[in-house]
Amino acid sequence: MTPPSLSLTASAPSSSASSDVLVLGARSDDEGVIVLSAGARDGLAAELAAVGFSGGKDELVRLPGAEGGPALAVVGMPDERDEDAFRYAAGTAVRQLAGVQRVALALPTETDAQLGATLEGAALGAYAFTEYREKTKAGVKEPVAEIQVVGRSDEGDALIARAATVAEAAGLVKDLVNAPPLDLYPATFAERVEALAADLPVSVEVWDETRLAADGFGGILGVGQGSARPPRLVKVVYSPDSATRHLALVGKGITFDSGGLSLKPASGMVGMKYDMTGAAAVLAAALAAAKLRLPVRVTAWLCLAENMPSGSAIRPNDVLRIRGGRTVEVLNTDAEGRLVLADGLVAAGEERPDAIVDVATLTGAAEVALGTRYAAVMGSDDLVADVIAAAKASGELLWPMPLAGELRATIASDVADIANANPGNTAGGMLLAGVFLQEFIGRSGDAEDSPRIPWAHLDIAGPAKGPSAPYGFTGKGPSAVSVRALIRLAEDFSGR
């Protein structure tokens, strides 16, 4: 989709010639409505009270504007003035004002951080996906095309550039996830990556099925061998000369997950095009780092396969040899994400980056435990703390989970180094997946007792699917969860 134009303006527009709607912020308490934005017209608080405005999150009230001026909209804001309050309020307003061409936001910003969050939230709220609509396209309101934010900053250009880049990254994830698996499969995904990278200072390397076999990527090959559309591994590298640290990102990219021979029920297959969200997120984060010219090396590994049943599909009890030689007995072909990630994690570790973060819609257990707003994170304590801090700063919800080493025996194999699942076990499925992945994290040096490379695993299965009802800047459909946190983490790694 085409992103909105963003700009800063020193004062709120007074004419409908420059803006169609002016958005203000307000809240309410026991004493009534409190308008937070400066310059509001006299009596506005009473008008809001008369129409039942409560100041809650996701609340937007539209009122007539002054004669000759833009219409007025008032969005609910909490009393807290953290960055996320501005991001959320701006996104709420812009999302709900779809169908309006030009919007100006005059929220009570006082700092560059609040101003940047307002720009970001507004841009995130201006998303729609209509590529596959024909007869019904006219019924979908166009997102806001022009966004002005009232505020001044010496860093205005940088704030606008960052907000636009973050919103473009989230939009890319949503576009990729929204695409049907008929059109987005491993080969076309790889082609899309090459096209996206063409004008950026990044390199792209693609492993087809022949090269995957030659280089020992048995997990990706095994998962993909049941499909008529063969798998791919895509490596995206942004490596500026100024970089002193290296962040590796590994994404699960199952373009459609039928479950393989361990077939899902029909209802369980609906939405399984979302199973490549992790790969889309790490791709978008790497491209964003390049657009922002961050002084940090970012390598994204996209592990792409389609998990389908056929006469050539892997079977329960088959043994796969992962890159590096470790063997895995497949006891559940629907626990395929960890198999492709294992290859990606080993490959990422061979370069000995400063940290590895993998992102995957990995387990239904994560959604059962944490619902559809929170993603899980587990791994090395210090890196997990860094990832959580990046998520908090970017307005994403992560919850730390333990790496339960005592569960390792649960996925022991009678014939291989490890099993990918324990079909009779119903407890701790999310934790078991993390314990499995930990087996494939490399060491930071040649010695066998060298410490393992810091690693964090994000299980985004719950929030990736998006809400059944929109909220904030997030509409129905894919949420682009984790991409903003990954961009912030790359910024933190760069020292910017």
UniProtKB/Swiss-Prot annotation:
Residues annotated to bind Mn(2+) 2: 252, 257, 275, 336
Principal cellular location given in the protein's record: cytoplasm
Species name: Leifsonia xyli subsp. xyli (strain CTCB07)
Record field: catalytic activity: Release of an N-terminal amino acid, Xaa-|-Yaa-, in which Xaa is preferably Leu, but may be other amino acids including Pro although not Arg or Lys, and Yaa may be Pro. Amino acid amides and methyl esters are also readily hydrolyzed, but rates on arylamides are exceedingly low; Release of an N-terminal amino acid, preferentially leucine, but not glutamic or aspartic acids
NCBIfam families linked: PRK00913.1-2 (NF002073)
Disulfide bonds: none
Family per similarity comment: Belongs to the peptidase M17 family.
UniProt keywords, alphabetically: Aminopeptidase, Cytoplasm, Hydrolase, Manganese, Metal-binding, Protease
The keyword Protease is assigned to this record: yes
GO CC annotations on file: cytoplasm
Source species taxonomy: Bacteria, Bacillati, Actinomycetota, Actinomycetes, Micrococcales
BP term (GO), one: proteolysis
Family annotation (InterPro entries): Leucine_aapep/pepB, Macro_dom-like, Peptidase_M17_C, Peptidase_M17_leu_NH2_pept, Peptidase_M17_N
Residues engaged in binding Mn(2+) 1: 257, 334, 336
Cofactor(s) the record lists: Mn(2+)
Identification of the protein by name: Probable cytosol aminopeptidase
Intracellular or extracellular location(s): Cytoplasm
A molecular function (GO) term: metalloaminopeptidase activity
UniProt-listed Enzyme Commission number(s): 3.4.11.1, 3.4.11.10
Active site: 264, 338
Cofactor binding notes: Binds 2 manganese ions per subunit.
